[in-house]
């Protein structure tokens, strides 16, 4: 049954009695009116009082506050989501900045690690390799028929926690919660999926409660054939769906994106979403520092698919600001565990090969060894931007940051690794080491830093600023693909929303409580870019704006009327 939430007309429901209360998308709990209780055989199944959604949310928030640790709060919120989705999103809307770290990073990492321990109720689809011949049937079994957004993972690279097997399902569930809470995508249109291809994590394989396929991960041709079976089944079932790849290992993430990005409307949030939000933050930071991105010299710690995806977006923006491709690439330095990527380094991955520095250009560098370390790069290249996507804590040392600050009045430092325990440096330390001069953005949430009687807000360079707006823009415009131009438009729109860039003070990124307005701004620019690039039907700007509002779902109860199947 298709649930058209956008309309304010009554919703005709064929279910009644206890069955109706079991549908999270339909259940109102104590908010069913007396007429509805009569028509749907609910008298006696609910307490006497008829409540508003505001009263329900107040009770839920009081209960939420009674939990003392974040893991228990996460479990509580997920229980509400699995019972009454409208109430869940009304609660999130009222307390978004407080609850976002609970439903997503960093708390979702713990939920993924303990998925089989805290499992209560099925949500989404579990597509397992042993049942690969029945994928079409599994998609037909989905409780939601008109799916418009899918987030899919294979659980191999969950945040900075590695292989969690089907425990990775916590990520698609959390991401889609933010598509709704931040981007207004109706929960009736979203579907989380985990591809269960086994796990190489001995803790999971040896856990008697692990609920996934107890088998080492399949790989190579066998793996890619299975993913292709899933993609083709999705295309048959929902040909116009937006599919987001999430937390695939870097050796699979880029090949899958390259293979399917021209075949269906899809993107990889770890590569493209992370790149888009980081680029938007850098554009804003550059403006706040009185310069353009083309003027920056950028050093990365971490040269995986996420880091290289960010680097390519930065290079594209530098080129759009007037640099040649050669000039732009010469300003970006990639460092991994083997040192700086150069044209003499063997065994580079395909996506790394275009991001090497030419050895001839490094002849004048003062080096301490044959392997060019991060310290060597900072001392010789004199970067103005330092980005961490290594997943290794504490690698942005005091010595390193102070060396950077010697040649850069306002260094831009972005330790983006998740969760908090994996961050390359803590914002408080960066602010102290630079005497308050650094512009800091992190991947996980941090409290403002107090330094010399001044409060420094710390921007969370969170993909949640980007992907909900992309999703809303795709749905509103009817885009058939997600192009690089649409992602670039999202980055520039985010930069325009920066309080620091606009006013010269405040946070680098907007307040999380303003993220719904930010998502609509991004959706508008994404939709316009889709039209310009020929992947969406051209309409007027006014029509696109109306489509965005029409597609923006609000957590409000509708009136129900009874009908038969």
UniProtKB/Swiss-Prot annotation:
EC identifiers of the protein: 1.1.1.38
Q: Which organism is it from?
A: Yersinia enterocolitica serotype O:8 / biotype 1B (strain NCTC 13174 / 8081)
InterPro entries for the chain = Aminoacid_DH-like_N_sf, Malic_enzyme_CS, Malic_N_dom, Malic_N_dom_sf, Malic_NAD-bd, Malic_OxRdtase, NAD(P)-bd_dom_sf, NAD_malic_enz_proteobac
Residues in the active site? 104, 175
Gene Ontology CC terms:
cytosol
Q: Where does NAD(+) bind?
A: 157, 270, 418
Classification via NCBIfam families: PRK13529.1
Q: How does it assemble?
A: Homotetramer.
One biological process term from GO is: malate metabolic process
Q: How is the cofactor bound?
A: Divalent metal cations. Prefers magnesium or manganese.
Record-given protein name: NAD-dependent malic enzyme
Query: Is Oxidoreductase a UniProt keyword of this protein?
Result: yes
Cofactor(s) this protein cannot do without: Mg(2+); Mn(2+)
- Lineage: superkingdom: Bacteria
Which CDD domains does its entry note? NAD_bind_1_malic_enz
- Top enzyme class of this protein? oxidoreductase
Please state which protein family the record places this protein in: Belongs to the malic enzymes family.
Q: Which gene encodes it?
A: maeA
């Amino acid at each position: 049954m298709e649930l058209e939430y956008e309309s304010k007309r009554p919703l005709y429901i064929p279910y009644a009695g206890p069955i109706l209360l079991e549908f999270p998308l339909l259940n109102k709990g104590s908010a069913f009116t007396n007429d509805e209780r009569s028509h749907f055989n609910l008298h006696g199944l609910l307490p006497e009082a008829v409540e508003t959604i505001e009263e329900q949310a107040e009770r839920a928030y009081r209960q939420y506050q009674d939990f003392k640790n974040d893991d228990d709060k996460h479990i509580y919120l997920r229980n509400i989501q699995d019972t009454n989705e409208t109430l869940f999103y009304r609660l999130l809307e009222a307390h978004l900045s407080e609850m976002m770290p609970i439903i997503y990073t960093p708390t979702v990492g713990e939920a993924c690690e303990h998925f089989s321990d805290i499992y209560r109720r099925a949500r989404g689809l579990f597509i397992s390799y042993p049942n690969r011949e029945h994928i079409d049937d599994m998609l037909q079994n989905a409780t939601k028929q008109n799916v418009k957004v899918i987030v899919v993972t294979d659980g191999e690279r969950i945040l900075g926690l590695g292989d969690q097997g089907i425990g990775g399902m916590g990520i698609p569930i959390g991401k889609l919660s933010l598509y709704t809470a931040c981007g207004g995508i109706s929960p009736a249109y979203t579907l989380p999926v985990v591809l269960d291809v086994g796990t190489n994590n001995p803790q999971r394989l040896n856990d008697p409660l692990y609920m996934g396929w107890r088998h080492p991960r399949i790989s190579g041709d066998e793996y890619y054939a299975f993913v292709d079976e899933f993609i083709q089944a999705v295309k048959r079932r929902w040909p116009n769906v937006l599919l987001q790849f999430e937390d695939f290992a870097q050796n699979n993430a880029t090949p899958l994106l390259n293979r399917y990005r021209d075949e269906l409307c899809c993107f990889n949030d770890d590569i493209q979403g992370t790149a888009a939000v980081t680029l938007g933050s850098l554009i804003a930071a550059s403006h706040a520092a009185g310069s353009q991105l083309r003027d920056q010299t950028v050093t990365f710690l971490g040269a995986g698919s996420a880091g290289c995806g960010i680097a390519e977006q930065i290079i594209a923006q530098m080129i759009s600001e007037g640099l040649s491709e050669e000039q732009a690439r010469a300003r970006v330095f990639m460092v991994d565990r083997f040192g700086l990527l150069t044209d003499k380094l063997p065994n580079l991955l395909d996506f790394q090969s275009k991001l090497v520095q030419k050895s001839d250009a490094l002849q004048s560098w003062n080096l301490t060894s044959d392997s060019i370390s991060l310290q060597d790069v900072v001392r010789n290249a004199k970067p103005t931007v330092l980005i961490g996507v290594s997943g290794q804590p504490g690698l942005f040392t005091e010595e390193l940051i102070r060396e950077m600050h010697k040649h850069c009045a306002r260094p831009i430092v972005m330790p983006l690794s998740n969760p908090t325990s994996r961050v390359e440096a803590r914002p408080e330390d960066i602010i102290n080491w630079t005497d308050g001069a650094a512009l800091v953005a992190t991947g996980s949430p941090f409290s403002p830093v107090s330094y010399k009687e001044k409060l420094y807000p710390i921007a969370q360079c969170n993909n949640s600023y980007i992907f909900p707006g992309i999703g809303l823009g795709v749905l509103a415009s009817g885009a058939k693909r997600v192009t690089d131009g649409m992602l670039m438009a999202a980055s520039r729109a985010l930069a325009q929303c920066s309080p620091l860039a606009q006013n010269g003070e405040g946070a680098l990124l907007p307040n999380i409580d303003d993220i719904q307005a930010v998502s609509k701004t991004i959706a508008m620019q994404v939709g316009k870019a889709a039209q310009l690039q020929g992947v969406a039907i051209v309409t007027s700007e006014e029509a696109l704006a109306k489509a965005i509002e029409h597609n923006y779902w609000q957590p409000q109860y509708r009136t129900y009327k009874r009908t038969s199947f």
